[in-house]
């Protein structure tokens, strides 16, 4: 094979359409735009989303408000009532809750919520506490220790 033997594959190089250069060219006179009308005029025929005068979809739908936060904090949550099964004076972490079978996953950082009653003194390590959870843990004689989010998610 020599350099002069190289040629493009058949059908790979199509000629550019020469529009409006006489009827023999196949695209003469109206240039493929049909007869009169808005779509045959110069410039963009209609705006994006135009539905022929019908009320368009973007105007039929309500304006959406209250979008969710883009970088919303996602937590693995647990209520203080579930911590009653743990032994007194123990340190509660994500790992200890997984080993005790109280949590099934540690995908997200831990947040302790305040539903239920707590009768056991515990040292709870979590990324976040609700106000009622913090008061219930401290009322039972326990300690709330806020850990960094990165430490919990590892």
Curated annotation (Swiss-Prot):
Keyword RNA-binding part of the UniProt annotation: yes
SUPFAM superfamilies found in the cross-reference section: Ribosomal proteins L15p and L18e
One Pfam family per UniProt: Ribosomal_L27A
Any one Gene Ontology BP term: translation
Disordered, as annotated region: 1-57
GO cellular component term, pick one: cytosolic large ribosomal subunit
A single GO molecular function term of this UniProt record: rRNA binding
Purpose: Binds to the 23S rRNA.
Oligomer and partners: Part of the 50S ribosomal subunit.
HAMAP family associated with the record: Ribosomal_uL15
PANTHER family: 50S RIBOSOMAL PROTEIN L15, LARGE RIBOSOMAL SUBUNIT PROTEIN UL15M
Family indicated by similarity: Belongs to the universal ribosomal protein uL15 family.
Matching NCBIfam families: rplO_bact
UniProt name for this protein: Large ribosomal subunit protein uL15
Protein source organism: Thermosynechococcus vestitus (strain NIES-2133 / IAM M-273 / BP-1)
């Amino acid at each position: 094979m020599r350099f002069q033997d190289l040629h493009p594959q058949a059908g790979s190089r199509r000629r550019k359409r020469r529009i409006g250069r006489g009827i023999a060219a196949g695209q003469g006179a109206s240039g493929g735009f049909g007869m009169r009308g808005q779509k045959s005029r110069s410039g963009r025929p209609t705006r994006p989303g135009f539905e022929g005068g019908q009320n368009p979809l973007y105007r039929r739908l309500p304006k959406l408000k209250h979008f969710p936060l883009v970088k919303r904090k996602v937590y693995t949550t647990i209520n203080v009532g579930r911590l009653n099964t743990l032994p007194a004076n123990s340190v509660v972490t994500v790992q200890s809750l997984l080993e005790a079978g109280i949590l099934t996953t540690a995908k997200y950082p831990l947040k302790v919520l305040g539903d239920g009653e707590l009768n056991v003194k515990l040292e709870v390590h979590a990324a976040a506490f609700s106000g009622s959870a913090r008061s219930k843990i401290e009322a039972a004689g326990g300690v709330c220790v806020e850990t960094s989010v990165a430490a919990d998610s590892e």
